[in-house]
């Protein structure tokens, strides 16, 4: 496995792979890797001849400087995990390598609508930072396939739209959320939880499952479902941030024509902001 830190070396390796006719998969990450990321690598390996994993804590997608500063950097451990899993390349650039002119003068990619709704409304600039860095990685790596986790539901929708709108000839693969045995969605931010909070954390998915059961049973009073869920989370010790039930295909409000709903969960537990989601087939 080759660890690459500069754009020229990355381009050199990509040119070589292209000359050899290799199919390339990209797995974009911010590091602090867990089993969910390893599932992305597995999917990438099954879909291509060469797997490039990027590890870059992207400052452009953080709306708070303190959040950026405390985000875990575990490059050595990450590379050891990736080597064991069979990744071929790790691209681990510095911010200066990715944004040589600084971020204030950086051209950016913005996806209208999806960037500013839901999660984007409470995190200004976050999705613009995501779409910009992913677009840059697409240009540098020139992958045939790129793998993203379904845990970040809105992000995946945004990447799919950006890929289509910008004319990238890249297959976007969404990989199902990996969960701990108690149901908690794996996330790098779970490391912010204390041991006591970690015991409470699976309550997020339990409340989400209850919401899904109500939808499957035909209940359509969304305000009542969300209010009950918010109360249940508060009783467990969470601070509900944003609970939504939307059309799974458009992320707009549910309509009589909606065939699938998505439950989007965001709640604070101590210093950790936990997110989760679940899609539900709707009976007409």
UniProtKB/Swiss-Prot annotation:
ATP binds at residues 30-37, 149-152, 178, 186-189. Beta-alanine binds at residue 61. It is found in: Cytoplasm. Pathway: Cofactor biosynthesis; (R)-pantothenate biosynthesis; (R)-pantothenate from (R)-pantoate and beta-alanine: step 1/1. It comes from the Bacteria. It is an enzyme of class 6 (ligase). The active site is at 37 (proton donor). (R)-pantoate binds at residues 61, 155. The reaction proceeds by a bi uni uni bi ping pong mechanism. This is Pantothenate synthetase. It comes from Cronobacter sakazakii (strain ATCC BAA-894) (Enterobacter sakazakii).
């Amino acid at each position: 496995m080759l660890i690459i830190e500069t754009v020229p070396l990355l381009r050199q390796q990509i040119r070589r792979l292209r000359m050899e006719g290799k199919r390339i998969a990209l797995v974009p990450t911010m590091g602090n890797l867990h089993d969910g990321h390893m599932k992305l690598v597995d999917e990438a390996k099954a879909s291509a001849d060469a797997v490039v994993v990027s590890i870059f804590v992207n400052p452009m997608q953080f709306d708070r400087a303190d959040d950026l500063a405390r985000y875990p950097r575990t490059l050595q451990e990450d590379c050891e995990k990736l080597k064991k899993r069979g990744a071929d390349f790790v691209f681990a650039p510095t911010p200066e390598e990715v944004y040589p002119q600084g971020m204030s003068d950086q051209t950016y990619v913005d996806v209208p609508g999806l960037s500013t709704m839901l999660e984007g409304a409470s995190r200004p600039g976050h999705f613009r930072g995501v779409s910009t860095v992913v677009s840059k990685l697409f240009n540098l790596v020139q992958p045939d396939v790129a793998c993203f986790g379904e845990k970040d539901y809105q992000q995946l929708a945004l990447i799919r739209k950006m890929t289509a709108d910008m004319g990238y000839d890249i297959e976007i693969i969404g990989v199902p959320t990996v969960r701990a045995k108690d149901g908690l969605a794996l996330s790098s931010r779970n490391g912010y939880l204390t041991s006591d909070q970690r015991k409470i954390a699976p309550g997020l998915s339990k409340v989400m499952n209850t919401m899904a059961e109500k939808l499957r049973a035909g209940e359509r009073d969304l305000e009542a479902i969300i209010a009950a869920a918010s109360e249940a989370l508060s009783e467990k010790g969470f601070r509900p941030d944003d609970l939504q039930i939307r059309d799974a295909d458009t992320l707009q409000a549910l309509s009589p024509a909606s065939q699938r709903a998505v439950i989007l969960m965001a709640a604070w537990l101590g210093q950790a902001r936990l997110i989760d989601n679940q899609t539900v087939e709707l009976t007409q």
